[in-house]
From Swiss-Prot:
Role of this protein: Together with LptD, is involved in the assembly of lipopolysaccharide (LPS) at the surface of the outer membrane. Required for the proper assembly of LptD. Binds LPS and may serve as the LPS recognition site at the outer membrane.
UniProt similarity note: Belongs to the LptE lipoprotein family.
Protein localization: Cell outer membrane
Organism: Photorhabdus laumondii subsp. laumondii (strain DSM 15139 / CIP 105565 / TT01) (Photorhabdus luminescens subsp. laumondii)
Signal peptide, first to last residue: 1-19
Lipidation (N-palmitoyl cysteine): C20
Name this polypeptide is given: LPS-assembly lipoprotein LptE
Name of encoding gene: lptE
Subunit comment: Component of the lipopolysaccharide transport and assembly complex. Interacts with LptD.
Single biological process term from Gene Ontology: Gram-negative-bacterium-type cell outer membrane assembly
Membrane-topology descriptor: Lipid-anchor
Alphabetically ordered keywords of this record: Cell outer membrane, Lipoprotein, Membrane, Palmitate, Signal
HAMAP family: LPS_assembly_LptE
A GO term for molecular function: lipopolysaccharide binding
Length: 182
């Protein structure tokens, strides 16, 4: 009896999550018009550009290397990393730092429309002066995680580009209908 109830509850949980549109974390429904992209960056082989490419590939986006006029372009404009001291030890050395990564990008559509994208990721980092090697390794891991999170946020923001394009198409259609009515 207990096995049947457990099976029923498990089956009900699966149906509820499947029925509400639940998707596993890490996948974004990238719009069809953005399934093929070209990426430009001042540092095309840098860690941020690699993270963005990886996230796009994970979301089944084809990245085109050659420039084509009919393909949207994701342009990574710049990124900045800041370290602010949040707390200090009694001797005045930094105990905790706030790490901030700001990324500015834009999507340039084939018709020339430009949609800005921004991502900001904040993390705290405990600075232990007694373990210098471990501190450096941990700092690099945190920076990589921040770049990956910023890349995921940029990919999610592609949905806003899709919605803006749909809104622009609706406005164009309404304008054409108004012109025909006159």
């Amino acid at each position: 009896m207990r096995h049947r109830i457990l099976t029923l509850l498990l089956g009900l949980a699966v149906l509820v999550t499947a029925g509400c549109g639940f998707h596993l974390r890490g996948t974004t429904q990238v719009p069809a018009e953005l399934k093929k992209l070209q990426i430009t960056s001042s540092d095309p082989y840098g860690p941020l550009a690699r993270s963005v490419r990886q996230q796009l590939r994970l979301n089944n986006v084809t990245i085109l290397e050659d420039g084509s006029a009919d393909v949207p372009v994701l342009k990574l404009i710049d990124s900045s990393e800041n370290k602010d001291t949040v707390s200090v030890f009694q001797d005045g050395k930094a105990a905790e730092r706030q790490l901030t990564l700001n990324v500015n990008a834009q999507v340039i559509m084939p018709d020339g429309s430009v949609y800005p994208l921004r991502s900001r990721v904040d993390r705290s980092f405990f600075d232990n002066p007694l373990e210098a090697l471990a501190k450096d390794a941990e700092n690099e891991i945190i920076n990589q995680e921040m770049r990956e999170q910023a890349a995921r946020r940029l990919v999610r923001q592609l949905l806003t580009v899709h919605n803006a394009e749909k809104q622009k198409a609706r406005e164009k259609q309404v304008g054409q209908q108004a012109a025909q009515a006159q």
